[in-house]
Amino acid sequence: MKLDGNAIVYCEGAFNTLNGKTAHGLVRFCRRYAIAAVMDSRYSGRDAGDVLDGKAGGIPVVDAIETAKQTAENAGMPATHLVIGIAPDGGRLGKSARQDVIRAIDMNLNVD
């Protein structure tokens, strides 16, 4: 199966919470994208698999969209997508999340 591209998973402030279940699935089982990084400033500098399961999986957690894009580029996986990995209460992204999405669009990332 052909991948749709390389993705940054957006999960700011929620990666290791129930609201981050979408991100958990993407990190553990994604077949649609190659996951290049997870964005959650609370766990920046850690490995996503280590945060979730105590087992490193080679996916870095970073603190910002710009950092995620650069990290992906440095790993030879230039990001093509920002995938929303949070499901906030009420289903609406907060103001800072919407600003992050706008920055991702400005960086020519597809948002899913």
Model-derived segments and spans:
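N-terminal phosphate-binding or glycine-rich loops at protein starts, especially the Walker A/P-loop
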Residues: 1-34
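Structural motif
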Residues: 10-14, 41-42, 78-81, 85-88
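Short, charged/polar "capping" segments at the starts of alpha-helices
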Residues: 17-18, 43-49
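Alpha-helical segments flanking ligand/cofactor-binding loops in enzyme cores
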Residues: 24, 102-103
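Short internal beta-strands
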Residues: 34-42, 111-112
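Glycine-rich, highly charged phosphate/nucleotide-binding loops
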Residues: 52-75, 93-98
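ADP-ribose/adenylate-binding Rossmann-like module
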Residues: 104-112
